[in-house]
């Protein structure tokens, strides 16, 4: 099967592209190579690479020619950046999804739209988000992803497009761009830099290893029912402050590095997914956080040549903009 993987040079997308290629599938990766896209993430993978924007209809048509399916990982994903400016999020996450839907509709091709638990918004204690829950996004990022999801739902109903949506919980693992909490805190700790913990640090996230996330998306690609939405949750809820303490232990650093800083505007307090629907199809997460987090810390410790060049230049300018006033 020939598959187009958009956003395939990013974090989750590159792991997925390599997974499909290793399974013997013919994989075409299309990626715009924005700040978080990195061709090095695909090193050694037998994939065809196309540098292009999913908003470019002609480029998408050329890359997708002959493909039996499209899996869309292409997205702007960082909440803090969306708060500073949302135009790129709207372009990629909303318009880009429309372009892909237009192509799959015309060509009778399957689409898997990779989305996020953040579209559900804040989840009260004692409950978990189900696939048919209302969407209540809290940030420009999650609103853009919800917009993409709604387009997919409408295209299935109106045009009969063959499409599924996955909504994943917070994902971690090797090759994650160091603006997200785990790689940010791990690399800062390894360098003896402050760990900027938002607010009281009691925000709760459901953690999922990237390989488990990719296994879920592959299962939906192969066996998911058209028009269905599948939550992909790791079932491991951890407060950010507890996650931070574990990172300190694993990096051999102490709590003097932790700096409680002004919270993010509109910061959701808790995410939690009910993934029983996908479990009914045959998926189960295979890697516990207690195993996956030490492996991830070890990867960043052993691969400074991957992340040190990233944490200079444009990244440093963003970091100063985001945290300099908060850190004082």
Language model features with spans:
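Short beta-loop-alpha junction of Rossmann-like oxidoreductase domains
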Residues: 41, 123-124, 174-176, 180, ...
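The catalytic Tyr-centered alpha-helix of NAD(P)H-dependent dehydrogenases
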Residues: 137-144, 174, 178-182, 206-210
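Residues that form or flank phosphate/diphosphate-binding pockets in enzymes
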Residues: 12, 37, 58, 176, ...
């Amino acid at each position: 099967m020939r598959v187009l993987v958009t956003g395939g040079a990013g974090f989750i997308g590159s792991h997925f592209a390599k997974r499909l290629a290793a399974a013997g599938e013919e994989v075409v990766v299309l990626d715009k190579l924005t700040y978080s896209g990195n061709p090095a993430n695909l090193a050694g993978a037998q994939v065809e690479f196309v540098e292009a924007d999913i908003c470019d209809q002609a480029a998408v048509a050329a890359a997708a020619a002959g493909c039996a399916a499209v899996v869309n990982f292409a997205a702007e994903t960082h909440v803090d950046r969306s708060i500073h400016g949302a135009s790129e999020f709207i372009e990629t996450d909303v318009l880009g999804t429309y372009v892909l839907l237009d192509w799959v509709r015309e060509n009778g091709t399957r689409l898997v739209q990779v989305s996020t638990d953040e579209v559900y918004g804040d989840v009260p204690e004692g409950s978990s988000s189900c696939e048919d829950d209302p969407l209540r996004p809290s940030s420009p990022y999650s609103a853009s992803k919800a917009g993409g999801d709604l387009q997919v739902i409408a295209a299935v109903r109106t045009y009969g497009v063959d499409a599924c949506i996955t909504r994943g919980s917070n994902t971690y693992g090797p090759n994650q761009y160091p603006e997200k909490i785990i790689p940010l805190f791990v690399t800062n700790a390894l360098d003896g830099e402050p760990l900027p913990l938002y607010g009281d640090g009691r925000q709760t996230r459901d953690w999922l290893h990237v390989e488990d996330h990719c296994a879920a998306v592959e299962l939906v690609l192969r066996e998911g029912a058209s028009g269905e939405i599948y939550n992909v949750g790791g079932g491991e809820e951890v407060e950010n402050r507890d996650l931070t303490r574990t990172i300190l232990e694993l990096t051999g650093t102490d709590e003097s590095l932790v700096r409680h800083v002004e919270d993010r505007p509109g910061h959701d307090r808790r995410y939690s997914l009910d993934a029983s629907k996908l479990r009914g199809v045959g998926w189960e997460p295979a890697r516990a956080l207690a195993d996956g987090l030490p492996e991830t810390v070890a990867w960043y410790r052993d691969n400074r040549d991957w992340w040190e060049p990233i944490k200079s230049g444009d990244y440093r300018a963003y970091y100063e903009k985001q945290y300099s006033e908060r850190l004082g």
